Each structure stands twice: as structure tokens, then as C-alpha cells.
């Protein structure tokens, strides 16, 4: 029987990989809590059922699994010529990332790449669309090269310039300050910058 573990979420394994020798100090009740709040068993059921899907078909399966309702205004304004860097606010976390990748991936025949948290590389169906960013440890030496290759590829780039999900600030949920990387790299590689704004809420 084939080993499908690469397709699954394994909180124990991720903690060991991210924390190294310190992983043994993480209390078991914390690990169990993490498994519950990320719905590890439920998600792994979804991943097993969709292990044959990669890229945009995987994102479409995610949309169906989440029962996400997406209303789009201005899709007719998406550029048809040239390469773009699409930048967006990040209010809903994974859901807006999945939605944006699905929408743009469908429109541009799968030619999209995300700059994302490297933990998402654990998702086999999403990994081919990802340029990984390490949020918890030292950045890979290959990171500058991967970003450069991404921006110089024939894929459109998707970025959330705040780098993190929106936070409540002064009673309002809003993005942190946007980093300017998307501007400098887009100028260097002659890409148009297209802003996208999300409004929504989790049910």
C-alpha cells in the first residue's frame, strides 16, 4: 500500500520539524489542543479524498469543502496582457488565500504562484503553487533565489503584503503595515500591480 503521509497534516511531525530538540518540551495537552482546533482528523479525511488533485483543482476542492461563497466585483478588469503581481488584504486567513488562488488560477489557466507561510508546503495539492516563507525560524538560503525565479517566471504572483492575517487594532480589524517588497520586485521585473480587496466574515 502506498504511503500517503506526505499528503496529510501531522501536528506532531510539524512541531518536531519546527522546534527541533525543543519539541519534547511542548506539553501533550497543547499538541492535542492544536490537533482539535485545526481539525486535523477532518482535514486529513479531505486530503485523502482529494490526494489526486494538484494546483487549481485542489483549490476548487478546498472551496467546496469550506462551503465558501464568493461574490466577485470587477473581474472584467483583470488584465489579459502582461504579467501581474496581485496584492490583497488578508482578513480571513486561509479562506481568502484559497479563494484568491482559485479565482485567479482559474482565470489564468493555473499560472499563479503564492508567497506563503512555508507550513503550507506540507499540503501536497498546494505546494506546486507556493514560494515558501519561513515565519518561525531562519529563512532558507534559497529564499531570495526562489522569489527572484517566481517574479521572473511566466506565472502571476499573489501576495499578502502585510505578511500576516489582519489584526484588531484600535477596535478595527485591519492589515498590519504592508511591506514594500511587492513594489520593488514588480518594478524590477516589469509587472503590473493589481490591488484586490476582500470583505467578508467567517460563519
Predicted regions and their residues:
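Soluble catalytic domains of membrane acyltransferases
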Residues: 69-203
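Membrane-anchoring hydrophobic helices of lipid-metabolizing enzymes
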Residues: 1-84, 97-99, 109, 127
Amino acid at each position: 500500500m502506498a504511503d500517503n503521509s506526505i499528503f496529510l497534516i501531522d501536528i506532531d511531525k510539524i512541531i518536531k520539524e519546527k522546534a527541533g530538540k525543543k519539541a519534547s518540551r511542548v506539553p501533550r495537552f497543547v499538541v492535542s489542543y492544536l490537533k482539535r482546533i485545526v481539525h486535523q482528523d477532518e482535514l486529513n479525511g479531505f486530503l485523502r479524498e482529494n490526494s489526486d488533485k494538484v494546483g487549481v483543482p485542489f483549490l476548487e476542492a478546498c472551496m467546496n469543502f469550506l462551503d465558501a461563497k464568493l461574490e466577485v466585483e470587477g473581474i472584467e478588469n483583470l488584465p489579459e496582457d502582461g504579467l501581474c503581481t496581485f496584492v490583497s488584504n488578508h482578513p480571513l486567513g486561509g479562506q481568502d488565500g484559497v479563494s484568491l488562488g482559485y479565482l485567479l488560477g482559474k482565470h489564468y489557466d493555473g499560472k499563479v504562484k503564492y508567497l506563503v507561510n512555508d507550513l503550507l508546503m506540507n499540503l501536497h495539492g498546494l505546494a506546486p503553487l507556493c514560494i515558501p516563507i519561513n515565519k518561525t525560524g531562519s529563512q532558507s538560503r534559497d529564499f531570495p533565489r526562489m522569489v527572484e525565479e517566481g517574479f521572473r517566471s511566466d506565472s502571476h504572483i499573489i501576495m499578502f503584503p502585510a505578511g500576516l492575517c489582519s489584526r484588531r487594532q484600535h477596535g478595527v480589524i485591519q492589515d498590519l503595515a504592508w511591506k514594500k517588497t511587492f513594489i520593488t520586485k514588480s518594478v524590477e521585473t516589469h509587472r503590473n500591480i493589481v490591488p484586490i480587496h476582500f470583505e467578508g466574515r467567517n460563519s
